[in-house]
Amino acid sequence: MFGAFIIGDELLVGKREDKHLGFLIGALAKRGLRLAWAHYLGDEPARLTEALKRSFASSEVVFSFGGIGATPDDHTRQCVAAALQVPLVLHPDAEREIRTRFAGQEVTPQRLQMGEFPRGAAIIPNPVNRIPGFSVGEHHFVPGFPQMAWPMVESVLDTRYRERFGSGKWAEASVLVFEAGESQLIPAMQAVERSFAGIKVFSLPSMGADGSRIHVELGVRGDPAQVGAAMERLRREVGAAGFPHK
């Protein structure tokens, strides 16, 4: 199972629009994988630390975007260390990358702070400016800049999780139902979910500008081997209930 943390006050106050969620969904889908959940978090250390504690207690693969720099509003590195109850230490590989990045310039303590990761972490190379991200177990922490974060995430997927590619394949099919409210379609939906363990049923109502109901998109998604039969069963249930559909 794959999850995501997307971190930064700038997202929650509307100063920046998130692009990471759409990217991650697409990057996983290209590899036959699916995103199970995503959480947006501000730059609030206590809340972030608690969220990380819960996440580290699971066996899920988690990508975290943002907050790994060295400015006062960057808390992710510190919160990961707090959640794991380990110190931040200057990672030798990160130090080497930082010194290479700033060759010929003063390598200040502030610059080296960007390479201080929770003890036991591994670095994620940054192909853009060489300031790395880091991994702790199945959790992977990358910068908030898409041009840096995205190739780093794809590299992690391709080097760490190739054996899982295709494990999250799914399919979807739907039908438009007219002259019915969602509540009237519940029996049909329940009948399908009872009969097909690998299938989820969904309903998406559409409204006109005046609030009048136009139709309900009713569908199934899940195991590709079951979608066809589940959709046929759903059509039969809707037809038996007397609702027009196409």
Spans of features found by a protein language model:
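Proline/glycine-rich low-complexity loops and linkers
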Residues: 47-50, 74-164
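Short beta->alpha linker loops
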Residues: 40-43, 93, 112, 180
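Generic secondary-structure signature for well-ordered alpha-helical cores
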Residues: 29, 33-34, 43, 57, ...
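Glycine-rich phosphate/diphosphate-binding loop of Rossmann-like nucleotide-binding domains
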Residues: 1-38, 43, 228-229
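N-terminal small/polar loop signature for handling phosphorylated ligands or for N-terminal nucleophile
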Residues: 22-83
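An accessory alpha-helical subdomain
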Residues: 138-237
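Structural motif
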Residues: 3, 60-61, 115, 122, ...
